[in-house]
C-alpha cells in the first residue's frame, strides 16, 4: 500500500474528521464563552467587588531606571520598559477567569446533556447456559 493511500485512509477514516470538526466548532464556541465571561459575568463581578482590578497588582523586583517615562504604578508600563516585576495580579485575574469559564462550560454541557435523548440500553447478552441449551436443541433437531 502506498503512503498516499495510507494517509488518505487515515485522514478520512476514524476520528480524524470528528476531531477536525470538533476543533473548528471549539474555536467558534470559545469566542462565545469568552464573550459571556468578559461581557456578562465580569462586569457583574466588578460591581460586586467595587471595581477591584487585580490585573495591575505586582511586586517590583528590580529598580526603575532613571530613563523610565511611564507610570511607575502601571505593570504594563514597567513590563514594556523591561523592569523586573512579579505580576501576581495578572495571574489572579487569569485564574478567576478560568474558574468562571470552566463553570460556565460545565453548566452549558450539563444543559446540552439534558436536551439529548437518552440512548437506549443495549439488549443484555444471552446467558451462556441458554446458548448451550439452544445448541443442544438444534443438534437434536438435526438427527
Swiss-Prot record:
Cellular localisation: Cell inner membrane
Keyword field: Cell inner membrane, Cell membrane, Ion channel, Ion transport, Membrane, Transmembrane, Transmembrane helix, Transport
Bilayer disposition of the protein: Multi-pass membrane protein
Keyword Ribonucleoprotein attached: no
Gene Ontology CC: one annotated term: plasma membrane
A single GO molecular function term of this UniProt record: mechanosensitive monoatomic ion channel activity
UniProt cross-references to InterPro entries, sorted A to Z: Mechanosensitive_channel_CS, MS_channel, MSC/AndL, MscL_channel
Segments passing through the bilayer: 10-30, 89-109
One Pfam family, short name: MscL
Subunit details: Homopentamer.
Entry similarity comment: Belongs to the MscL family.
Summary of the function given for this chain in its UniProt record: Channel that opens in response to stretch forces in the membrane lipid bilayer. May participate in the regulation of osmotic pressure changes within the cell.
PANTHER family named among the record's database cross-references: LARGE-CONDUCTANCE MECHANOSENSITIVE CHANNEL, MECHANOSENSITIVE CHANNEL MSCL
Protein name: Large-conductance mechanosensitive channel
Gene this protein is translated from: mscL
Amino acid at each position: 500500500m502506498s503512503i498516499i493511500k495510507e494517509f488518505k485512509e487515515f485522514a478520512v477514516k476514524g476520528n480524524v474528521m470528528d476531531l477536525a470538526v470538533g476543533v473548528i466548532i471549539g474555536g467558534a464556541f470559545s469566542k462565545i464563552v469568552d464573550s459571556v465571561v468578559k461581557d456578562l459575568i465580569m462586569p457583574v463581578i466588578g460591581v460586586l467587588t467595587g471595581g477591584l482590578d487585580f490585573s495591575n497588582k505586582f511586586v517590583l523586583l528590580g529598580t526603575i531606571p532613571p530613563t523610565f517615562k511611564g507610570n511607575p504604578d502601571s505593570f504594563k508600563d514597567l513590563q514594556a520598559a523591561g523592569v523586573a516585576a512579579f505580576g501576581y495580579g495578572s495571574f489572579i485575574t487569569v485564574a478567576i477567569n478560568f474558574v468562571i469559564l470552566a463553570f460556565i462550560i460545565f453548566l452549558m454541557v450539563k444543559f446540552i446533556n439534558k436536551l439529548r435523548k437518552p440512548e437506549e440500553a443495549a439488549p443484555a447478552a444471552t446467558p451462556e447456559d441458554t446458548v448451550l441449551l439452544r445448541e443442544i436443541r438444534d443438534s437434536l433437531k438435526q438427527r
